[in-house]
């Protein structure tokens, strides 16, 4: 059976190794008007897909993330099912946004930006990784 996440990771690494940063950004920009959407996700799923994978790019290139309101909209559709899909266990912790009115989970509050929360719940970063980066910003 094919693991899509593994495939996507390999494809992204390949593209990054053969394309310039400008080419990668242009590739994303030319797809903005593409009518494709993830199966079963509708418009909200398409937005989530683009924001999450857009963060994969902006984080790697050190660029500004999408606006907080856009990320919050994606977070609004997130919950236990998403955590399970990505293999994330909050383990008695609650993620609380510092830049929007949003939280997920129960337990000890962990205060993070909406961007960092989305990176955590999609298993792009761990709580210790984003907590350390937040401390460095203080």
Name every feature range the model reports, one short phrase each.
Residues 1-6, 16, 22-138:
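Structured surface interface patches that mediate subunit assembly and partner/cofactor docking
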């Amino acid at each position: 059976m094919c693991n899509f996440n593994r495939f996507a990771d390999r494809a992204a690494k390949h593209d990054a190794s053969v394309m310039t940063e400008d080419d990668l950004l242009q590739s994303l920009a030319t797809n903005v008007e593409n009518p494709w959407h993830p199966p079963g996700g509708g418009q909200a799923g398409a937005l989530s897909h683009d924001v999450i994978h857009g963060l994969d790019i902006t984080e790697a290139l050190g660029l500004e993330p999408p606006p907080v309101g856009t990320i919050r909209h994606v977070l609004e559709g997130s919950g236990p099912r998403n955590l399970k899909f990505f293999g994330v266990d909050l383990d008695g912790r609650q993620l609380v946004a510092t830049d929007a009115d949003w939280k997920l989970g129960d337990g000890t509050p962990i205060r993070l930006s909406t961007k960092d929360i989305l990176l955590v719940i999609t298993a792009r970063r761990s709580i210790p990784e984003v907590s350390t980066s937040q401390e460095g910003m203080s």
